[in-house]
Amino acid sequence: IVKPNIGLKGLGVVEIKNADELENYYKNSDYDFLIQEKINFKNEVGIFYHRFPDEKKGKITGMVKKEFLSVKGDGKKTLKDLVMENPRSAYQIKAVEQQMRNEMQKIIPENEVIILVPFGSHTRGAKFIDISTEVTEKLAQKIDEICTKVNGFYYGRLDVMYENIELLKNGENFKIIEINGSKSEPTHMYDPKHSIFFAWKEITKHWKIMAKISRKNHQAGFPYLNIKEGFSALK
């Protein structure tokens, strides 16, 4: 997997299959990028975590399951037909054709599920399901153990790949593919079952947490961003 070193919303994230594709990505990139192992676990969650600088233990404030964009075959239609049937997948047609150009005219067998975009980003067609109620003490302890080892990390979302939800809840058999900092969102709010009012409430709650962390860091001697630095960070 190739991705921008500093990215947003899954933009620029591509699965590379050979050296030619990597060279093409390099030639068309005007930014620093990372080459990352492709994790073959089937599932992904986003785990939102925070810890106040003067406290030893942090907290998980939300967990979201990411359902990758996919289609199911009926034994009659081509992959392209199936993609175009669903507005969510049709919106991603250009990206799908780039990655699966040799498969678009294949008839997909009945009930076979094809993952179109193997990235858990809302802007890449993934559906977000709030599973915050699945957070266990064992999982919270393991995430806390990991995050406290990252110097200066007090707030953000960990994107995690896993195979089995029960093992994940036990704090086992998962891999972290990204750690997102203060620009990250509590993406469990994007579950279609939640209202806009729930989303506003979650955003407000997390901004208050981030502001409190900022004040505590300032008290410890870390300077606030000036106006120029603040606007630059927003770009």
Model-identified regions with their sequence ranges:
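Conserved active-site beta-strand-loop modules that form the wall/rim of enzyme catalytic pockets
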Residues: 46, 56-59, 103-107, 112-115, ...
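Generic detector of well-ordered alpha-helical segments enriched in charged/polar residues
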Residues: 23, 27, 80, 140, ...
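Active-site nucleotide/adenylate-binding loops and adjacent lid/helix of ATP-dependent enzymes
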Residues: 1-98, 136-140
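Coil-to-beta-strand transition motifs
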Residues: 42-44, 52-59, 152-155, 169-174, ...
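Hydrophobic side chains in beta-strands
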Residues: 49, 65, 160-162, 179-181
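A long amphipathic alpha-helix within ATP-dependent nucleotide-binding catalytic cores
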Residues: 81-170, 216-234
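C-terminal active-site "lid" helix and adjoining low-complexity regulatory extension at the edge
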Residues: 163-235
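A generic structural signal for short coil/turn motifs at secondary-structure boundaries
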Residues: 10-12, 129-130, 188
